[in-house]
Amino acid sequence: MRRVILPLVMTVTLCLAQEASEACTKALTDCENDLECQNRLAPLMAACSTNTCQPQCRSAVLNVYQNKLGRILLRSDATCIPGRDELRTCNFLPAESTVHCSLGKLACEGDLQCNSKFGVFMSECEADAARGACTDKCKTLLNQTIETSVGSVFSNCTCTARDDQLCTNLKDNLLGVCLKNTPGVTLSPSDNSITDAPGGNDLADSSVGHGFNILSAISVYLLTVLVF
């Protein structure tokens, strides 16, 4: 049995390794060689493997992003990160076109230009937006935030079905009120969990396809062992 299992593990590992880009592999190695980044990365590896966009995965991603080497890894193409399909589907990757609102806020707070614009918007407009009101001044302030390179994620950021109120409050009560009826802005749905995704979700399909490729490799190997 051991003679069968060892090559099987090597086959699966090879299938995964062949898809990893050099940039992602370097970023992952750098993170694993740094104790702080490694300690932040371990919970992500464990939590982001259920394909259900759990809060534990979100918290782990936000924790990794607060580390410099972790940010570099998450900003890569993520081809070397286990659970990458879940990270994409849950919008937990900062380089994607649609980003989780809490991750977008964290990225904005780390950028001087975005943070200064967003800080003014929050101080001037948070109270009114919480009541469902948004003045023209507040719309202008939010647009100024969105016009920054990092703040652009606020125009279509999203939450998952299992999110806490911090994300939904930011998306629906603060951003949503002022983005409503804004030309060129399309609000993303809050629910983007894998388990509840519609059948036409390309990201969910890619996740299934990736798993199918691995299972195919395993099936071919086992068939070879049984025949020969």
UniProtKB/Swiss-Prot annotation:
Query: Which residues comprise the propeptide?
Result: 206-228
Q: Which residues, renumbered to this chain, are glycosylated?
A: 143, 156
Localisation per UniProt entry? Cell membrane
Q: Which UniProt keywords apply?
A: Cell membrane, Developmental protein, Glycoprotein, GPI-anchor, Lipoprotein, Membrane, Signal
Which pairs are disulfide-linked? none
Q: Which residue(s) hold a covalent lipid per the annotation (GPI-anchor amidated aspartate)? A: 205
Q: Which membrane topology term applies here?
A: Lipid-anchor; GPI-anchor
Please give a single GO biological process term from the UniProt record: negative regulation of cell cycle G1/S phase transition
Q: Principal localization?
A: membrane
Q: Which GO terms describe its cellular component?
A: plasma membrane; side of membrane
Task: Look up the signal peptide feature and give its range.
Answer: 1-17
Q: Give one Pfam family, short name only.
A: GDNF
Q: Which InterPro entries match?
A: GDNF/GAS1 (IPR016017)
| Expressing tissues | Pharynx muscle cells from its early formation, in the two-fold embryo, until the adult stage.
Q: Does the keyword Zinc apply?
A: no
Report the function annotation for this chain. Answer: Role in pharynx function or development.
What protein name is recorded for this chain?
Growth arrest-specific protein 1 homolog
